[in-house]
Amino acid sequence: MREEFMEELLRQAGEMTVLISSHELGEIDGVATHVAFLDEGKLLFEESMGDLTARFREVHVTTDREARPPGQLPRHWLDVKAMGNVLMFVDTRFSDDAFGEEVSSLVGGVRRIDAQPMALRSIFTTLARAARDGDEVRAARLGVRS
């Protein structure tokens, strides 16, 4: 039913701007051109879907030994954790250009780097968690308003 509603709404909207408010992020993932995230009534940020999904990646770095986060974490790495020989994090400023070099310079013994695009729901969860963790400096650099 919701899918039919969305299809009909888009068909009738034409060139109009339509504002959709939903906690079901999966429903708007392929429809929205711009998104704004609210958390507990606060605007975290707004951005075009293209820019947002281009800069967020879930990264897994496989190393030749037990993985450890670098001593000085880049501010654009969130949810950093290590399990065995894999270091995992979310990169909020992903760019193909220098990504591999940056990771290799910060994490020793890199064997493989896997960076996957993230769904809108995962991006929101990551940003909401960062904002709630109280790191106002990091949140401000990410464009999250506290």
What are these model-derived regions, one by one?
Residues 3-94:
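ABC transporter nucleotide-binding domain
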Residues 57-135, 140-142:
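Short, charged/small-residue-rich alpha-helical element at the C-terminal edge
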